[in-house]
């Protein structure tokens, strides 16, 4: 059997293609409350940095806003910017957390990535942030 896949690769982009500048916010009118906001999508996709094969995941973004909410269309564009980025699953979830915490400055945020199976192993990553004082 020949290894005709050995040299096969798909286009893989670097982290510079992650577009956090597309994010927009909406003023949150209830900063004194501890309301939990949750967004769920099963359309997240990035690629393996070594093979270029897709890594598809269900993402849950859960947070307690302080002064800002993320505008959903901008969030969709931000997440879509990962589509051809070569990034490890664990790094993608932490990068999303870092970018959204920097942008929104929430009281609390948790990102859960549930990636489809590879080699019979599914991966679930949970990254959290909690503001010390608010």
From Swiss-Prot:
It holds the Pfam family QueF. Signal peptide: none annotated. Its EC number is 1.7.1.13. Substrate binds at residues 70-72, 89-90. The active site is at 48 (thioimide intermediate), 55 (proton donor). It is an enzyme of class 1 (oxidoreductase). Keywords: Cytoplasm, NADP, Oxidoreductase, Queuosine biosynthesis. It is found in: Cytoplasm. GO terms for biological process: queuosine biosynthetic process; tRNA modification. It catalyses: 7-aminomethyl-7-carbaguanine + 2 NADP(+) = 7-cyano-7-deazaguanine + 2 NADPH + 3 H(+). GO terms for cellular component: cytoplasm. The keyword Glycosyltransferase does not apply. Catalyzes the NADPH-dependent reduction of 7-cyano-7-deazaguanine (preQ0) to 7-aminomethyl-7-deazaguanine (preQ1). Belongs to the GTP cyclohydrolase I family. QueF type 1 subfamily. NCBIfam families: QueF-II (TIGR03139). This is NADPH-dependent 7-cyano-7-deazaguanine reductase. It comes from Caldanaerobacter subterraneus subsp. tengcongensis (strain DSM 15242 / JCM 11007 / NBRC 100824 / MB4).
